[in-house]
């Protein structure tokens, strides 16, 4: 029996990791939950669903070391899917990792789950915090595993988030030339990969990369146009120099976090190697598959709207 504690288990990625762990035999899944955390109905429902499948809730707060000592007792692996600023990503994760060491945990996953953040430009707040936390955690006597997946395919192509392509109005918006390569992986595939790494019997310390696609903005636009049999109106928002100027002039780097992300995407090289085939049962969602499904869903919505 492998015991896995997940911090951030009520978020999109964390609950998907928990779900994939529950699909495996012989895994004890524990979810670190603050007693005082506000109860979002959606998250509460997801939490109760995981509990109904066999997960257990463990009270704890990354700002309370004593609670972390209790939460990490009898645990083999800790996975952090936490989001936030310095008090969470640096202070909280380091406190969680230190509690893990004190209680004999052997493997720890910091909340990386991104492009190659170690090569990201200095100043990007979301990546600077993680690099700082990772350096402190790497120094501890743990098997530390950094999962890098590129950008989340589903979020980058969702018009309600990054909004690269919007089939509602046949538009596309991008930064750069459109030919800069980057990696994309769905959040669910990233979670599945992480869940398998968590129970891998080998010492898997270090950086582990997975990628559903290496692509460009122009390739995404061209494939969308082919599938939808349409022509998108493409808006170039600016180039890398424009992004550098915007981020440099901002009084608060968090106010331009999207611009920092796109600057990183178009300037950080794609992965030179991946471990896509480490687990044969993990069939990654390709860009074509994702865009095909998205187009079919769009057609269904159009049909419903016309009926």
Predicted feature locations:
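A hydrophobic C-terminal alpha-helical subdomain
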Residues: 239-307
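Catalytic cores of nucleic-acid ligases and guanylyltransferases
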Residues: 81
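Receiver (REC) domain switch-region micro-motif
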Residues: 78
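Cofactor-binding loops of NAD(P)H-dependent oxidoreductases
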Residues: 60
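Catalytic domains of carbohydrate-active enzymes that cleave complex glycans
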Residues: 235-237
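Oxidoreductase cofactor-interface core, primarily capturing Rossmann-like NAD(P)-dependent enzymes
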Residues: 2-46, 53, 63-66, 70-71, ...
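An anion/phosphate-binding loop that grips the pyrophosphate of nucleotide cofactors and donors
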Residues: 75
